[in-house]
Amino acid sequence: MHPSHPKRPLPPRDRLATARLYLCTDARREKGDLAKFAEAAFAGGVDIIQLRDKGSPGEAKFGPLEAKAELGALAELKAVARRHGGLVAVNDRADIALAAGADVLHLGQGDLPPWYARRIVGPDVVIGRSTHNRAQAGLAAIDEHIDYFCTGPVWSTPTKPGRQAAGLDLVRSTADSHPTRPWFAIGGIDLERLPELLAAGADRIVVVRAITEARDPEAAARALKSALLAAS
């Protein structure tokens, strides 16, 4: 008899294909509960957690998250994600994504070009892109170096101060173009607004405060995931 082996997780792109609920969180340095929070979020049905500490309470209290500390936080997230089959995303930094062994690198419009980021992280890391208008979404939908894109902000949000909300029209136009790769709506999304978003054609979402500020993050994630799955 051959010894049994633990089931290997699916490659990141295969898990991306079924992902519906994407969470951005800061490192929660002022609370010191990142691993516990991530455990609750993944248990509630979050598929992807991105670490994004810009503008966070921890940054205000302790200063910018340095590379060593970011790698430590990502290691915490990866340990939890591994238990749940979830994905861990790095924001902006291709070098950090490579060093951390992250599943996903997410790039903004002002970050490294996707083709150059791909040279750094290699062929297996999922690369995502933020888009804020129809033209950017259209380009992201056909860029061979991008695996998914986010479009928004649908509604104004304090996590992106100064960025004008794109509204549901951007969601509708993106849905109507029938992209062949996964795309997520982002910006000001919560359980109350989710029906409008689903009606506009989105079936994948990125949230922040809807889970990070919830009294019960696991329950908040479960409610969002249930609504997404019920509509699919």
UniProtKB/Swiss-Prot annotation:
Binding site for Mg(2+): D92, D111
InterPro entries: Aldolase_TIM, ThiamineP_synth_sf, ThiamineP_synth_TenI, TMP_synthase
Annotated positions binding 2-[(2R,5Z)-2-carboxy-4-methylthiazol-5(2H)-ylidene]ethyl phosphate: T157, P158, T159, G188
GO MF, one example: thiamine-phosphate diphosphorylase activity
The reaction(s) this protein catalyses: 2-[(2R,5Z)-2-carboxy-4-methylthiazol-5(2H)-ylidene]ethyl phosphate + 4-amino-2-methyl-5-(diphosphooxymethyl)pyrimidine + 2 H(+) = thiamine phosphate + CO2 + diphosphate; 2-(2-carboxy-4-methylthiazol-5-yl)ethyl phosphate + 4-amino-2-methyl-5-(diphosphooxymethyl)pyrimidine + 2 H(+) = thiamine phosphate + CO2 + diphosphate; 4-methyl-5-(2-phosphooxyethyl)-thiazole + 4-amino-2-methyl-5-(diphosphooxymethyl)pyrimidine + H(+) = thiamine phosphate + diphosphate
CDD domains cross-referenced by the UniProt entry: TMP_TenI
SUPFAM superfamilies per record: Thiamin phosphate synthase
Cofactor detail note: Binds 1 Mg(2+) ion per subunit.
Cofactors (names): Mg(2+)
Residues engaged in binding 4-amino-2-methyl-5-(diphosphooxymethyl)pyrimidine: Q50, L51, R52, D53, K54, N91, S130, K160
Assigned keywords, A-Z: Magnesium, Metal-binding, Thiamine biosynthesis, Transferase
Recorded superkingdom: Bacteria
Keyword check for Translocase: no
Residues passing through the membrane, by range: none
Pathway: Cofactor biosynthesis; thiamine diphosphate biosynthesis; thiamine phosphate from 4-amino-2-methyl-5-diphosphomethylpyrimidine and 4-methyl-5-(2-phosphoethyl)-thiazole: step 1/1
A cellular component annotation (GO) from this entry: cytoplasm
Record keyword Magnesium present: yes
Family: Belongs to the thiamine-phosphate synthase family.
HAMAP family per UniProt: TMP_synthase
Protein purpose: Condenses 4-methyl-5-(beta-hydroxyethyl)thiazole monophosphate (THZ-P) and 2-methyl-4-amino-5-hydroxymethyl pyrimidine pyrophosphate (HMP-PP) to form thiamine monophosphate (TMP).
Protein name as it appears in the record: Thiamine-phosphate synthase
Organism: Nocardia farcinica (strain IFM 10152)
